[in-house]
Amino acid sequence: MPISRTYAALVVWLLVPAVAGAQSANAAVAPGSPTADRLPIYEIDPTCPPTLPNDWILGDIRGLFVDDRDHLWVIHMPSSLTPQEIGAAVKPPIADCCFPAPPVLELDPDGKVLRTWGGPGDGYTWYDQEHGIYLDHNGFVWTGTSNGHHVMKFTQDGKHVLTIGTPGVNKGSNDPDHLGGPANFYVEPKTNEIFIADGYI
């Protein structure tokens, strides 16, 4: 199939600014430049997190948040783990290890697990694909799902406070009344309003 001139022009129009932007970005952070000296340097800490208790392992990590105490909040997707990875949890067990960790974990700056929670409970529908975690200015924990069409608010101990959206209900990308797949959230402290990035449809 021949490529139209319009299509070719569009590709060039998109690529030229991208290449130019990448070159200027590289020049802006050249080693020894004043800008490069101010950039943070990150190092991998292979000891964090330490071995989790209870023979727990994490599935796909779907969200991280560092609170004002430097505690790391993690939300992961236990359903992403294979039976071979959680051999002790399958019925009947096929191995001595391991078990899926609860979906939400709080770790202190040293990597010690302080709290865990998440999963099905009374009064709310838990997710099958967890996605995103955020702590607001009042200390509430917000979580979401990439396919369940709702966001939930919890206390730091995992007590359900609020659900926004209707679990399992969405009428497509033009549906003004339901969430698609909320990807992230932010609560504005001045107004106490939540902003939801509805990034998956």
Q: Language-model features: where?
A:
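Eukaryotic scaffold repeat domains enriched in small/polar residues
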Residues: Q23-I201
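Bacterial N-terminal signal peptides
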Residues: A8-G21
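Hydrophobic alpha-helical segments and their boundary regions
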Residues: T6-Y7, C48
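N-terminal secretory signal peptides that target proteins for export/translocation
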Residues: M1-R5
